[in-house]
């Protein structure tokens, strides 16, 4: 589908990569932002219609800082359909089927109400280690704290998710399906620690903690309580097994293989380097 693409979550892990790909391709897009023109604010529905003006398709990322974000997303989707938006693409999670809590509720709503939709269901993001929940303790404590035990995940690079989103948004045909997006290898957090250790040249360990303790760590980082508990429960699913599945959806949609974790680790050594070591230089 061609036409103006509205990218929500435009400064997030996948959104900024999608914006870059749209810009590089010379395609029209609007990066949804409170500071954009027109402004867009999840907490202010009065801003939505202007942001949706002349939009052909929407890339939909859950807002992290509003109460009951999934009800808010459905409200926004109703507005999008009233404005004549043709295609709606939701970023969900591999572990959440249609009808499941949270993103799964929005997935089900799209199936029941939308004529042209797609849902991207990525596994765990590689970027959780380089700019998310695990960055600070890797950099400052040489430790990854998780509740995943020996569970495995097929970690995926956010750039690969964005490339898949680009392909789905531009697809000439109606898709009306979901895609489980994963990397090409299923590895444990112990193995993640080994790969980051090899890339950084120092030992990074993996320490198992309870789901409750992990949620408390997320709260201490400033995440809202609902988000902290949701994320901790999501990581618990890795210990339970479902995140270990591997699919070829990235290659099918983009024509390219998924990024290996080793390549990701080698490209991100600088973010895990303690400040004093960066100041000293080589």
Describe the residue ranges of each PLM region.
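Cofactor-binding loops of NAD(P)H-dependent oxidoreductases
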Residues: 40
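Oxidoreductase cofactor-interface core, primarily capturing Rossmann-like NAD(P)-dependent enzymes
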Residues: 2-34, 43-45, 53-56, 64-71, ...
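Conserved N-proximal alpha/beta basic substrate-recognition cap immediately N-terminal to
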Residues: 74
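A hydrophobic C-terminal alpha-helical subdomain
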Residues: 212-282
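Catalytic nucleophile serine of serine hydrolases
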Residues: 92-93, 257
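A short, acidic, flexible beta-alpha connecting loop/helix-capping segment that sits on the rim
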Residues: 34-36, 253
């Amino acid at each position: 589908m061609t036409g103006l693409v509205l990218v929500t979550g435009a400064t997030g892990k996948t959104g900024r990569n999608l914006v870059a790909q749209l810009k590089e391709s010379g395609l029209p897009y609007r990066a949804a932002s409170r500071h954009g023109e027109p402004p867009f604010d999840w907490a202010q529905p009065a801003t939505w219609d202007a942001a949706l003006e002349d939009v052909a398709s929407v890339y939909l990322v859950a807002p992290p800082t509003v109460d009951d974000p999934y009800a808010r997303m459905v409200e926004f989707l109703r507005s999008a359909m009233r404005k004549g938006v043709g295609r709606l693409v939701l970023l969900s999670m591999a572990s959440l089927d249609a009808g499941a809590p949270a993103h799964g509720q929005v997935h089900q709503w799209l199936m029941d109400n939308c004529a042209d939709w797609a849902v991207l269901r990525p596994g765990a993001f590689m970027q959780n280690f380089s700019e998310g929940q695990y960055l600070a303790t890797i950099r400052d404590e040489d430790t990854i704290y998780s509740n995943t035990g020996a569970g495995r995940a097929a970690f995926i690079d956010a750039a690969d998710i964005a490339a898949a989103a680009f392909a789905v948004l531009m697809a000439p045909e109606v898709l009306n399906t979901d895609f489980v997006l994963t990397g090409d290898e299923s590895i444990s957090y112990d193995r993640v620690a080994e790969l980051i250790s090899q890339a950084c040249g120092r030992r990074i360990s993996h320490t198992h903690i309870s789901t409750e303790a992990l949620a408390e760590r997320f709260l201490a980082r400033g995440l809202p309580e609902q988000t902290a508990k949701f994320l901790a429960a999501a990581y618990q699913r890795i210990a339970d097994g479902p995140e270990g599945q591997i699919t070829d959806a990235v290659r099918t949609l983009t024509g390219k293989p998924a990024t290996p974790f080793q390549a990701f680790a080698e490209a991100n050594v600088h973010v895990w380097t303690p400040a004093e070591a960066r100041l000293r230089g080589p």
